[in-house]
Swiss-Prot record:
It comes from the Bacteria. GO terms for biological process: cobalamin biosynthetic process. Pfam families: CbiA, GATase_3. GO terms for molecular function: ABC-type vitamin B12 transporter activity; catalytic activity. It comes from Vibrio parahaemolyticus serotype O3:K6 (strain RIMD 2210633). The lineage of its organism: Bacteria, Pseudomonadati, Pseudomonadota, Gammaproteobacteria, Vibrionales. The keyword Endoplasmic reticulum does not apply. Catalyzes amidations at positions B, D, E, and G on adenosylcobyrinic A,C-diamide. NH(2) groups are provided by glutamine, and one molecule of ATP is hydrogenolyzed for each amidation. The keyword Transmembrane helix does not apply. This is Cobyric acid synthase. Residues 252-439 form the GATase cobBQ-type domain.
Length: 483
């Protein structure tokens, strides 16, 4: 079935206005109608990424949006991915592959070249799909970023696509955000805007009506919908760590994750956060690691810098105390590398060349290399004389020499990870390690001999996507939008 509107771009008044969620919902709405739809985001900045079936790397939001379309994600759905590795620099991923590290000024100069890549990927998608739902980045009204823009109106003008603008009413100032954003656009860009969407509304819509009437009168643009605040969508966050859950004293397992400065793929912990038998706590700057059954060191975009940060917080001492008291420790990806004896970066892959002494809890030596491992993987976890299937993915630079026992047998015949001789410390390169209920229960048995409630995380995500689509169908003027 063909869509009446081949492409539509969702831009926002701010970051976290609801662009990713709205695009996911629109994708599911169109997919329900039998339309061959795909998501697209020209430029994304995120440390939470996903691996595509063709061995590339894209923003996680586009992987979720592809799921909403009932299709597999590809690198062309997010042709430019920026992964910050310092306050002023980032690794640039182009069509799924690492290009180089750039500072902000260098990337600004490179954007003219990047636009060609963006338009190439968009062209490929338009030939394969009937409808493309496009997500902008941040706000189109950032004056200092408008020159050479490839993320918002610069792309919309180049690709000649219509735009809707979404704002989050929950943070306040929604009318100023929408009116001001439109006012800061050029005349041709304003003409491109079909209307507004207000997101995360709570209360009586009748009390909002006078404001909606004012906005439409002042701008000449319709408000296409007011979407309710949807709690507990259970979709993977792209940037911000999900707010701390309320802790329950009667749970079976307490898990603590130290928040590193460049923490990446913290979506690994969503399945733990959503399990009613698990308390998941994030420990931040200046806080102690305490009252844990399991400490997990997460992935990071800057392993050596974050290892130094971990030590500066005294978390290395907290971890040693935890082990002396019989607790368990895991490391995922960069966190796994930290648990080893040494991390060498002779070529300056992550910054200045050099070596760092790890925590020394696993007999593992890592050398960071320029080539990045990007694979989807299935494996068998062998732990405490039991086995469980694991599905995950690898996103890392570096190769590790492992002298400890390796608990994971990969589907390609290789082994992954390490477990200490004492049996209390384990590491793996696999993200998504806990998503399989069988593997999660094997881990919880290893930690403290308990089993937790089995939940299918994919089912929870599907429920969240469908709730968004239901709200869009109920509260948005889709006839006007897609006429």
């Amino acid at each position: 079935m063909k869509s009446a509107i081949p492409s539509l771009m969702v831009q926002g008044t701010t970051s976290d206005a609801g662009k990713s969620v709205l695009v996911a919902g629109l994708c599911r709405v169109l997919a329900r109608k039998g339309i061959n739809v795909a998501p697209f985001k020209p430029q994304n900045m995120a440390l939470n990424s996903a691996v595509t079936k063709d061995g590339g790397e894209i923003g996680r939001a586009q992987a979720v949006q592809a799921q909403a379309c009932n299709i597999e994600p590809t690198v062309h759905m997010n042709p430019v991915l920026i992964k910050p590795n310092s306050d002023t620099g980032a690794q640039i991923i182009l069509q799924g592959k690492a290009l180089s590290n750039m500072d902000a000024a260098s990337f600004h100069d490179y954007k003219k070249v990047a636009m060609n890549t963006v338009l190439d990927s968009f062209s490929k998608l338009t030939k394969e799909f009937d409808s493309i739902m496009i997500e902008g980045a941040g706000s189109p009204a950032e004056i200092n970023l408008r020159e050479g823009d490839i993320a918002n109106m610069g792309f919309a003008e180049a690709a000649d696509v219509p735009v809707i603008i979404v704002a989050d009413i929950d943070r306040g100032g929604v009318f100023a955000h929408l009116y001001g954003t439109l006012a800061l656009l050029s005349e041709s860009e304003q003409t491109r805007v079909k209307g507004f969407v207000i997101n995360r509304f709570r209360g009586d819509i009748r009390l909002l009506q006078s404001g909606l009437d004012w906005l439409e009168e002042k701008t000449g643009k319709p408000v296409l919908g007011v979407l309710p605040y949807l709690h507990g969508l259970n979709l993977e966050a792209e940037d911000a760590i999900t707010a701390q859950q309320e802790l329950n004293s009667e749970v079976k397992l307490n898990v603590v994750v130290p928040v590193l400065t460049r923490i990446s793929n913290h979506t690994d912990f969503d399945v733990l956060r959503l399990n009613p038998d698990i308390n998941l706590s994030y420990v931040g700057k200046g806080e102690k690691i305490d009252k844990a059954d399991l400490i997990i060191l997460p992935g990071t975009k800057s392993v050596r810098d974050d290892l130094a940060y971990l030590k500066s917080q005294g978390w290395d001492k907290d971890i040693l105390r935890h082990i002396r008291l019989g607790g368990k420790v895991m490391g995922i990806c960069g966190g796994y590398q930290m648990l080893g004896k040494t991390i060498d970066d002779p070529d300056g892959v992550e910054g200045e060349p050099g070596s760092s002494e790890g925590l020394g809890l696993l007999n593992v030596h890592t050398v960071l290399t320029g080539s990045k491992q990007l694979t989807k993987t299935e494996a068998v976890l062998n732990l405490n004389n039991q086995k469980a299937k694991v599905k995950g993915y690898e996103i890392h630079v570096g190769r590790s020499q492992v002298l400890d026992e390796q608990p994971l047998e990969l589907d390609n015949g290789e082994c992954d990870g390490a477990i200490s001789e004492c049996g209390q410390i384990m590491g793996t390169y696999l993200h998504g390690f806990f998503d399989e209920a069988e593997a999660l229960n094997l881990i919880t048995e290893w930690v403290n001999g308990t089993q937790v409630k089995q939940q299918d995380f994919e089912v929870l995500k599907e429920q969240g996507i469908n709730r968004i689509a239901d709200a869009i169908e109920q509260h948005m003027n889709l006839d006007f939008l897609f006429k």
